[in-house]
């Protein structure tokens, strides 16, 4: 049951976009060898645009070892308030708010209803609503203004790395030189043999705003690797949306221990 919960939590954490104004965004850009870390952070923060709601269809491909599955998910978001996910026919549905993480699975008649502290303990790293929302929007998982960074160039991206890297929890941010959203976010806990890498392979323009189009998540624990690919289609912004969620009666609660 715990492995099943881990799968669902990972999918939530990383889902954690047809619309006439949608088009692909070029990932090419001119790299400036003398740009400072503060300039990069300011440019990245400018991309955190304001919107009321977001809606998208998401194709999710999941692989672990010899096992692979694919899902079609409807994603709805009210910025800073709600992230809502529903698989085809509502077989699996989730609702995430700043205070709660809830989902149910009609395939095995189970549900989970708890706060982020339980999920953080399960994953071995602190997680909150803002982290999940930022991940979906190509923003940094953690506040870049709370640490001092060095800036350098790697391949076709800018790299931000903490000046005082924590050996227990290492993190690197790779920024796209065209629009300064994330190319990749890489977190590792070497002593625990854990690694999480989030790659933003493509972006798209929606109503003059830049949003992720393809996200790839690689999670490694010991020698076990999980890969999740997500493609965001039919994205629309600022429509009136509903977020229906009610745990069916008679379902068994999933307990995290």
Q: Each PLM stretch: what is its role?
A:
Residues 121-163:
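Hydrophobic, well-structured mid-protein blocks that either form specific transmembrane helices
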Residues 82-130:
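An acidic-aromatic
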Residues 70-74, 93, 111-113, 172, ...:
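Well-ordered beta-strand positions in beta-sheet-rich domains
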Residues 15-18:
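C-terminal motif of bacterial Sec signal peptides marking the signal peptidase cleavage site
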Residues 10-12:
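Cleavable N-terminal export/targeting peptides
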Residues 1-8:
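Bacterial N-terminal signal peptides that target proteins for export
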Residues 21, 150-257:
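Gly/Pro-enriched, hydrophobic low-complexity segments
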Residues 23-100:
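Start-of-domain marker
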